């Protein structure tokens, strides 16, 4: 009975999408024509931070190094902010270096950003193939992927295969200790996408996001991070109503610097938790 009802709902939704296809097409073209194209922010895309005033050896390295790599699309690249300091990585690095657990476990944080606007899961996979293997294994790799797959003609099967391949190359070539996939954003809430197109795009994003979550659950040391957007709004509003558009950049599509800050906080919390857990496993 339940299965029959689900099938009926799918048929109804499919029929609705067929009827609304001309509207979706018109709105999609209008968005491409009218939406402001924001550039990737200027700023450093790699760096080294010394923790606890730890000395650097003659080779430029200290004893315990945390190697962090952020990979992905325009959100990882920080589009929507003016500089990399105001972007996801720019917020993430100082938050991480202030964590007592990071300071006690590591002397140095090496970080790099490998992200490009418009990249799909296939583009990211290709980038990981092209990049040289690191001289040291990557302790944490954070991936932002899926939005461009949602807006392109990537099937659910293609998405699943490409995510699996990303996991394989990250672990094999980069020696990734902890791999974190960030959840897809709530695309139906993006100010730049009008109704009814927003619901159509949001539904496809949800399908890819659910698939991503399931894939991550089948692999060791691969984590799906469900970004808590409600928490971001609650922390910013402090109990008073706010316009959700403050969380988005001027294009109504990418995160604002404000959202990047809240997002980075959640990513940092997860990284600390994962490193603590993996260190405990290694020592037991």
Over which residues does each language-model region extend?
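N-terminal secretory targeting modules
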Residues: 1-68, 268, 272-275, 280-284
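Substrate-gating cap/lid alpha-helix
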Residues: 189-228
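Alpha/beta-hydrolase-fold catalytic nucleophile elbow
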Residues: 144, 182-183
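Histidine-centered active-site loop/cap adjacent to the catalytic His
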Residues: 245-284
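Short, flexible, mixed-charge acidic loops at enzyme active sites
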Residues: 233-246
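Conserved SGNH/GDSL esterase-like catalytic core that processes O-acyl groups on lipids
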Residues: 65-69, 75-161
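Short, amphipathic alpha-helical "lid/cap" segments that border enzyme active or binding sites
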Residues: 121, 125, 160, 164, ...
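A short helix->loop->beta-strand "cap" motif at the edges of active sites that frequently abuts
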Residues: 174-178
């Amino acid at each position: 009975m339940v299965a029959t009802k689900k099938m009926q709902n799918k048929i109804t939704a499919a029929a609705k999408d067929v009827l609304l296809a001309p509207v979706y097409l018109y709105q999609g073209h209008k968005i491409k024509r009218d939406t402001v194209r924001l550039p990737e922010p200027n700023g450093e895309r790699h760096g080294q931070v010394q923790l606890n005033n730890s000395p650097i050896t003659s080779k430029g390295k200290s004893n315990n190094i945390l190697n962090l790599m952020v990979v992905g699309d325009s959100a990882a690249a920080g589009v929507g902010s003016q500089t990399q300091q105001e972007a996801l990585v720019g917020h993430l690095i100082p938050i991480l270096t202030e964590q007592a657990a990071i300071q006690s476990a590591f002397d140095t944080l090496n970080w790099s950003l490998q992200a490009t606007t418009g990249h799909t899961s296939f583009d990211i996979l290709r980038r990981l193939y092209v990049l040289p293997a690191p001289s040291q294994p990557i302790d944490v790799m954070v991936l932002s992927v899926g939005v461009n797959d949602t807006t392109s003609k990537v099937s659910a099967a293609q998405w699943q295969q490409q995510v699996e391949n990303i996991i394989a190359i990250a672990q094999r070539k980069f020696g990734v200790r902890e791999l974190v996939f960030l959840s897809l954003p709530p695309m139906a809430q993006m100010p730049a996408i009008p109704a009814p197109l927003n619901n159509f795009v949001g539904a496809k994003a949800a399908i890819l996001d659910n698939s991503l979550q399931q894939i991550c659950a089948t692999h060791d040391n691969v984590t799906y991070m469900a970004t808590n957007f409600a928490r971001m709004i609650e922390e910013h509003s402090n109990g008073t109503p706010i316009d959700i558009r403050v969380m988005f950049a001027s294009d109504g599509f990418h995160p604002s610097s404000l959202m990047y800050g809240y997002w980075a906080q959640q990513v940092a919390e997860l990284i600390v938790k994962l490193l603590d857990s993996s260190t405990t496993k290694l020592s037991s």
